[in-house]
Curated annotation (Swiss-Prot):
A biological process term (GO) from this entry: succinyl-CoA metabolic process
Domain ATP-grasp: 9-254
Protein name per UniProt: Succinate--CoA ligase [ADP-forming] subunit beta
Binding site for Mg(2+): N209, D223
Gene Ontology cellular component terms for the protein in this record: cytosol; succinate-CoA ligase complex
Record pathway: Carbohydrate metabolism; tricarboxylic acid cycle; succinate from succinyl-CoA (ligase route): step 1/1
Binding, ATP: K46, G53, R54, G55, E109, S112, E117
Residues the record lists as binding substrate: N274, G331, I332, M333
Record-listed E.C. numbers: 6.2.1.5
Catalytic activity of the protein: succinate + ATP + CoA = succinyl-CoA + ADP + phosphate; GTP + succinate + CoA = succinyl-CoA + GDP + phosphate
Organism: Rhodopseudomonas palustris (strain BisB5)
PANTHER family for the chain: SUCCINATE--COA LIGASE [GDP-FORMING] SUBUNIT BETA, MITOCHONDRIAL (PTHR11815:SF10), SUCCINYL-COA SYNTHETASE BETA CHAIN (PTHR11815)
Length: 399
């Protein structure tokens, strides 16, 4: 789960991490009060969306002006003007895709006098099963670009969970960033606080870009991006309360209500499969035969008729879906349950695209019988290869 920048900074503030003061606003009329509360003389007005590249982004609407999603204001009137322009406008960045995202909230923050910009992040390194620090002197820009152009400017190290964070980790960050004396001590303290927050809140990623050294000689987190382990949210009600569903895919939200593993993709063939491995294999073979999947959907091992019906409805709600492939290998999952769910869903929502069903495993004959006698226009398949070819050919014929 992701949260907004201003929410991430509030979390960091709980752990004593130095961040700039600011106020979120949801209406343009709130901008003046926020600016006056901060005092000035310089403010930063930041679009709050779940995507990076906001500063270099562009708004679709001409009324939003030609500046990016992060703007420097030198007067209260300028703060008010920016709020009026940016709120409810559509911001397009390198991470939003061409559709962009609507800006429904802004963060008005005090300006900072910046001497140097750095990059610092923590993430779960799956290769080592440890928390990894990624550090660079090249802050305020895309770390992907730095990794591509000057990889030698990125340093990373992992933390042994048996020892936890230690003083030498902080010194490693300070040395990488070229910090000495008082600034080195600040870096050591910051590293400990960030690691503590990362563990305490079950984060998957914490990115500070940029981490700045101000002209007053202080380290400050000027931006913050966080994502959390969804499986751990049950023990973090405070974090779960920060969820902004308007930033998420509506189909993925609906799928989560039924404990379905669903991810929207940009293809045209909807997939319903049980098991993540089989789901990925199904997506691969669709690609092999020249088309692309519209989603990843794993209904799990013990899905009920209602769960299968919900899954089918979610797939058909996607206007990009031109065909559907259901691929079930029944172990714990029974093929007749899948068949009943599919039939119920089709009768409820209708079927305007080709549907191929491949069933194998527990109660397979009963499942095939249910499909056969349903009166629905369903193409049966004997195996995965057969199923993929049939759905691809069927979609091409319709097109």
């Amino acid at each position: 789960m992701n949260i907004h920048e201003y929410q991430a900074k509030a979390v960091l503030r709980e752990f004593g991490v130095p961040v700039s003061h600011g106020y979120p606003i949801f209406k343009a009329s709130e901008a003046e009060a926020a600016a006056k509360q901060l005092g000035g003389p310089v403010w930063v007005v930041k679009s709050q969306i779940h995507a990076g590249g906001r500063g270099k982004g562009k708004f679709k609407e001409a009324s939003a002006g030609d500046k990016g999603g992060v703007r420097l204001a030198k007067s209260i009137d300028e703060v008010k003007d920016y709020a009026q322009q940016m709120l409810h406008a559509t911001l397009v960045t390198v991470q939003t895709g061409p559709a962009g995202k609507q800006v429904n909230r802004l963060y008005v923050e005090e300006g900072s006098e910046i001497d140097k910009e750095f990059y610092l992040s923590l993430l779960v390194d799956r290769a080592t099963s440890r928390i990894s620090f990624v550090v660079s002197t090249e802050g305020g820009m895309s770390i992907e670009d730095v990794a591509h152009d000057t990889p030698e400017k990125i340093v990373s190290f992992t933390v042994d969970p048996a020892t936890g964070i230690m003083a030498h980790h902080g010194r490693a960050v300070a040395n990488t960033l070229g910090l000495k004396g008082e600034q080195a001590k600040q870096a050591e303290s910051l590293v400990t606080k960030l690691y503590t927050a990362f563990l305490a809140k079950d984060m998957e990623m914490l990115e500070i870009n940029p981490l700045v050294l101000t002209k007053q000689g202080d380290l400050k987190c000027l931006d913050a991006k966080m994502s959390f382990d969804g499986n751990a949210l049950y023990r973090h009600a405070d974090i779960q309360a920060l969820r902004d569903e308007t930033e998420e895919d509506a189909k993925e939200i609906e799928a989560s209500k039924y404990d379905l593993n669903y991810v929207t993709l940009d293809g045209t063939i909807g997939c319903m499969v049980n098991g993540a491995g089989l789901a990925m294999a199904t997506m691969d073979i669709i690609k092999l035969y020249g088309m692309t999947p519209a989603n990843f959907l794993d209904v799990g091992g013990g899905a009920s008729k209602e769960k299968v019906t919900a899954a089918f409805k979610i797939i058909t709600a996607d206007p990009n879906v031109k065909g559907i492939l259901i691929n079930i290998f029944g172990g714990i999952m029974k093929c007749d349950i899948i068949a009943e769910g599919v039939v119920a869903a089709v009768k409820e929502v209708g079927l305007d695209v080709p549907l191929v069903v491949r069933l194998e495993g527990t109660n397979v004959e009963a499942g095939k019988k249910i499909i056969k006698h349903s009166g629905l226009n369903v193409l049966p398949a004997d195996n995965l290869d057969d199923a993929a070819q049939k759905i691809v050919n069927a979609v091409k014929q319709v097109a």
